[in-house]
Every structure is written in structure tokens, then in C-alpha cells.
Amino acid sequence: MSRRDDRSDTLICSFCGKSQEEVKKLIAGPTVYICDECIELCNDIIAEESKLEDATATDVRKLPKPQEIKEVLDEYVIGQSRAKKVLAVAVYNHYKRVEAAVKPGDVEMQKSNILLLGPTGSGKTLLAQTLARILKVPFAMADATNLTEAGYVGEDVENIILTLLQASDYDVEKAQKGIIYIDEIDKIARKSDSPSITRDVSGEGVQQALLKIIEGTVASVPPKGGRKHPQQEFLKVDTTNILFICGGAFPGLDSIIQQRIGVKTLGFGADVKKKVEKKAGELLAGVTPEDLLKFGFIPEFVGRLPMLASLSELDEEAMVQILKEPKNALIKQYQKLFDMEHVKLKFTDGSLVAIAREALKRKTGARGLRSILENAMLDIMYEIPSQSMVKEVVINEEVIYSKEKPIIVYENVAESA
């Protein structure tokens, strides 16, 4: 590179071409010159690269430990202690593997994808969402019942990756370390445990389509979703380090486990059957890969989900705890809304039990709690903003069972509404 302008004795920067009159400082080397502006730019580039290297080196140390992960899960999800431990360990090991620099000859560590088994409303989705929040990674959720294998009417499995990309603002690097939760995974089991000779586009076919992205592949994702066509441009996403959590209720799986362990359910065993049904959650806790094969999953798919965690059905006591104890408990949310109106909201113990019992009748687990509360609270939430001098609102069991109006306490006078 020239160190002088050929037309004069003016010195110029060998990198940007600016003359010594255009810059503050020009530093000479053996055959080149560099200006202060280029030096500053080089410093910025080096500093940025150092930050990235430091971040990679310290991410493993910043990763929450399994006990810390479970403690945060306890703040949002009631019960399910063993499932939380399985999730905490699996997630910790997964991200430890992701952040560790793999050297030639190192032991190859496989992904710790997770299968959650448990009844509707037992907390499967909430656990997955909370994990993503703890780890500050993008989270996407998909419904397995909408998926079909490529070429059939329905949603391509690659669109799951698109949802994760959208959650990470199309930052491919961030998306490649995200979490995907696939709900209703039991719905893609084939209809029998023998291989099908006909096309099963929403069962075994979907399992085959999911295999590669769950294990790890470079997926071609249409930026706007929908079906692929040859003229389209695709985003390339490596799914190797994406953690997949699959969940489902698995109705009938407990019967398969009963048959395997030899529980008597006929004749004189009628009483035994009643006891076993009460402990369906305990049966699911003993699930094996062979049980999942009989349920209708192909061996390769079961092999991609090595971590199994079962969730038990919620009882009345757990439902009451869910209403009032978690950080985002429904009762706390409603009380906050009333606080904004400068009104105290109180729920009696009887009202909480009534809400829990109504939810248990609906057999929708914790999901039913919100709709019961919304229905009970609608009228009072409509009226309170327009009323003055209201000091307190009390919700008792009659509001839930008999649709009676809540008790309203005014600033100076207490009376029933």
C-alpha cells in the first residue's frame, strides 16, 4: 500500500485513504500509515468479538443449577415435585451440552428431549413456559393435532420452527437455542401397535416427519409460513440445540401399564380396579419405552425422547393451592385489579373450595379455574368501577354455587349487594 499521495508529499491512511489533514493523528509503520479513526474502529471490532467469546465461556457458569430451576418452578407450579426434578436436570444438562465447546475425540452427548405425561390441566404447558422464562430463551408451542406430513392438508412440521423464529424476532442464533413445546403428542400415535400398510398422515407419518427436527437437522423454513414451493426463499435453522418438550394426556396408557405389571381388573378384582384408577398418576410414573410402543409410537420416535416425566392428577387441595399460592395465582391477579380501583377483594376459604370442586367436576384440571372465576366475577367487575365509597368486596361459596351477588362493604356502611 502507498504511504504517500502520488500527487504530493501528503501522507494518507493506508486503510481508509484519508489524508493527514482530514484526521487527528496518523501513525507510521514500516511501509504503511494508519489514522486514529481506523484504530478506533479496530478497537471496537476486537472488543465486540471479545464480548462474544467471554459470553460463550461464562454461559455455563451463569446457567441456573437444577435446584435453582426447581425452586423457581415451585413458585409458579403447585406439586408435581418429581416431574420438576426431571425437567430441571434434563434442561440443565441440555444447555450445559450446548454451551460446552466440543473438541475432536470428545464423548458425544445426545439431546435430552423430554416427554411429559399427565392429564389435562395438570401443568405440562405451564412447566415448559416457565422453564423458557427461567433460562431466558425463545419459546414456541405447537399442537400436534394440526400437524401432517409434507404434501397433505394441514400444517408442515417445519412451521413449528417458524413459530420459534417469530418468538425470537427472526434471530436465527437465538432460535437455535430455544425451547419448543408440542402439546397433544399422544394424538399422533398410530391406531395400533403394528406397522400400518396404509398411509397414516396424522399419526405415524407425523412421527416420521418430526424425527429429524427433534433429533437435529438443518430445517428449511418458509419465512411467511404455509406450504413450501420451489420459488420460495428459505431460512436455514439448525435444530440440533433446540430442546423439544412433548406433552400429552395419554388416555389408555395406564391400562397398558396395568397389563404389563399384572394388575387384576376383572372378577374379584373389581375393588382393586377402583383403587388403581385413583392411582393412575402412579401408574404413569412407571411408564417404560415398551409401553409407549404399545400405545402407538414408533421405536425411533420414543428413542428421541429419552427423558420421561409423569404428572399426577390434581386433587381439591392442590386446586385450592393453585388458586392462591403461585406468583401468578388467579386470586392475586384479581386482587391486584381491585387494588387499582382502591377496593379490597377477599375470598373466603369456602369460596376457594367451591371453585376447586367446580373445576374438578369439569375434568379440565387447573384450566377450568379461570373460566369459573371469570363467570363469578363478571357482574361485580362491571359494577365496581362506577360505584364510589366501596371499601371491600367479599366472595363466599354462595357466589360460586348459587350465583348470588358478593358482599360489598362500603366506607361507612356494610351491606349485601
UniProtKB/Swiss-Prot annotation:
GO terms for biological process: cell division; proteolysis involved in protein catabolic process. Residues 1-54 form the ClpX-type ZB domain. It comes from the Bacteria. Keywords: ATP-binding, Chaperone, Metal-binding, Nucleotide-binding, Zinc. InterPro entries: AAA+_ATPase, ATP-dep_Clp_protease_ClpX, ATPase_AAA_core, Clp_ATPase_C, Clp_protease_ATP-bd_su_ClpX, ClpX_bact, P-loop_NTPase, Znf_CppX_C4. Belongs to the ClpX chaperone family. ATP-dependent specificity component of the Clp protease. It directs the protease to specific substrates. Can perform chaperone functions in the absence of ClpP. This is ATP-dependent Clp protease ATP-binding subunit ClpX. It comes from Citrifermentans bemidjiense (strain ATCC BAA-1014 / DSM 16622 / JCM 12645 / Bem) (Geobacter bemidjiensis). The lineage of its organism: Bacteria, Pseudomonadati, Thermodesulfobacteriota, Desulfuromonadia, Geobacterales. The gene is clpX.
